[in-house]
Each structure stands twice: as C-alpha cells, then as structure tokens.
Amino acid sequence: MTQPTPERASRRWLTVVRLPKAAWVFGASVVSMAILGAAAVILREPWVFPSLGPTAFLLFFAPGGPQSGARNVIAGHGIGVAAGVLALAMFGLLHTPVDLEDLSWQRAAAAVTCVGVTLGAMVLLNVPHAPAGATT
C-alpha cells in the first residue's frame, strides 16, 4: 500500500474544507433561481436570464465582495436593462421581435452600444457588477 503524498493529503483536506461552501453555493443558487423561475412562469415575464448565474455565484460565494453588494447588483442590472432599451430604441428595434438567428447591422450596433453604455455607466456611478455587462 502506498503512503499518501503530502500533495494528495493537502487536496483531500481542501476538498473537505470546500465541501460546506460548495453545498451552500449550490443550494442557495438553486433555491433563488427556482423562485425566479416560478415567478417567470406565473407572471409570464423573463425573470431568469443568463447574467443571473454569475450574480448568484458572487452573492453566495463572496457575499462581502465589492461587486456583491445590493446597491451594485440592483444598480448594475438596472443600468443594463435601461441601456438595452435605450440602444434598441436608438436603432429602431424596440418593437422588433427577438431574433437569435438573423444578425443585422442594426442589432450588432445596438448590442455594441448597449454594452458600452452599461459598462461606462457602472464605472461613472461607481456601481461595478461585472455580470450586469451581460444583462444587456
């Protein structure tokens, strides 16, 4: 029988230490996304969108982090939504149905504008929340 190497013992210890945190992040994110998913189904509104995954990770993995504060999360995503609506309106796409297959110059310009406005506004207002850049 081989003796455990210090590296292997160290990895085992780290796994034991990380397990409760991993379980917390898993459970809290599943519950929070399930609540939003249920609200989306009941209200027939898109309450679940891709940038919420990284937001949930920040909130549950590093709740005291600079990007995890309620102000940054709410303001960041709010800026992303507002920038998205503004960009769609600027390029005449506000009342156009969603189209994930046909990219036009208008859609590309709206996306570029939206991301730029979102990121710039978060810096200007000092509410950095990286996942909000994907809310656009």
Task: Spell out what each predicted region is.
Residues 78, 124, 130-131:
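Alpha-helical architecture
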Residues 48-53, 129-135:
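Transmembrane helix boundary and interhelical junction motifs in multipass membrane proteins
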Residues 1-96, 102-112, 118-121:
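Alpha-helical transmembrane segments and their membrane-interface boundaries
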